[in-house]
């Protein structure tokens, strides 16, 4: 079973992702802020995190730094504000980077999760 945390300050987008990925092999939690994500991460170990970069109470890096300390965890940053510095930072921490406007979003997410 894959335990996934989706973090996005746009609840509709977070729920859309959760519904796309929900299935018998996925347990999905959502958080709508950096603070809420950190609280959930204190209570549960996530194998995967899909994180928005820009949120009212912080940036994706605030969450990535916690996840990067777990060698078994993977993360992907989804952003609607493409930026080369953000992309480089994500790769530096060993994550994946994807723009929300990518027309092949579902296939990219499946590749990230290791699903065929």
Give the location of each predicted region.
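Conserved acidic carboxylate
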Residues: 8
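Two-component/phosphorelay signaling modules centered on CheY-like receiver
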Residues: 11-29
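Acidic, metal-coordinating helix/loop segments flanking the phosphotransfer/catalytic sites
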Residues: 30-48
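Acidic catalytic/metal-coordinating carboxylates
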Residues: 33, 59-62
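Active-site residues of response regulator receiver
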Residues: 52
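The feature encodes the CheY-like receiver
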Residues: 56
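Short amphipathic alpha-helix used as the core "switch/output" element in two-component signaling
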Residues: 61-72
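Hydrophobic/aromatic residues positioned on beta-strands within the core alpha/beta folds
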Residues: 78-80
């Amino acid at each position: 079973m894959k335990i996934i945390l989706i973090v996005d300050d746009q609840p509709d987008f977070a729920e859309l992702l959760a519904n796309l990925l929900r299935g018998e092999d996925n347990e999905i939690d959502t958080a709508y802020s950096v603070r809420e994500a950190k609280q959930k991460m204190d209570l549960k170990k996530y194998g995967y995190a899909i994180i928005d970069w820009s949120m009212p109470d912080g940036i994706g890096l605030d969450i990535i730094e916690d996840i990067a300390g777990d060698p078994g965890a993977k993360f992907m940053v989804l952003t609607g504000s493409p930026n080369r510095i953000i992309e480089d930072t994500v790769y530096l921490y060993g994550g994946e980077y994807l723009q929300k406007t990518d027309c092949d979003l579902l296939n990219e997410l499946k590749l990230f999760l290791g699903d065929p």
